[in-house]
């Protein structure tokens, strides 16, 4: 069964007593989320030199997702939603911020265009430093729903704090 078919079937069930909200988030990240963010944190702590590549990725902090879903439930809304953080996820900036909050000195280096072309052919490089964004107009706030606004540095600080707390437990 495809996602599209499943969503259509769910939408056919909508009634006054049964609400359906479909949430299509981008990459979810946080201290205990499975996936590539944990690997990125570990890699960041080990690499004193980071390529300065300006990429953009739509992402959503797990705490922002849970708050958004709480709003959907409390307002009993229906529809299709594409929530994302108020900032785009920039891999170099995130790695730099992780190192800064870990009290590690970091050097950002600009990549020569010839090397950049070579690295862009590598899947792992494209996954880390490629662009993948939702349009800001894709999610229209027509039901007074909002994703908690935040600054990347504050979100990373929260993640680092949670990670440190878990490691001590």
What residue ranges belong to the model's regions?
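Active-site Tyr-X1-5-Lys
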Residues: 1-21
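Conserved donor sugar-nucleotide recognition element shared by glycan-biosynthetic enzymes
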Residues: 2-6, 33-37, 58, 91
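Conserved active-site beta-strand element of glycosyltransferases/polysaccharide synthases
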Residues: 20-22, 49, 82, 108
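Flexible, glycine-rich beta-alpha linker
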Residues: 21-39
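Short aromatic/basic micro-patch
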Residues: 22, 56-59, 88
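A conserved pocket-lining segment of Rossmann-fold NAD(P)-dependent short-chain dehydrogenase/reductase
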Residues: 42-60, 68, 82
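Two-component system phosphotransfer/interaction surface
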Residues: 63-74
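Mid/C-terminal beta-alpha module of Rossmann-like enzyme folds, strongest
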Residues: 72-127, 149-169
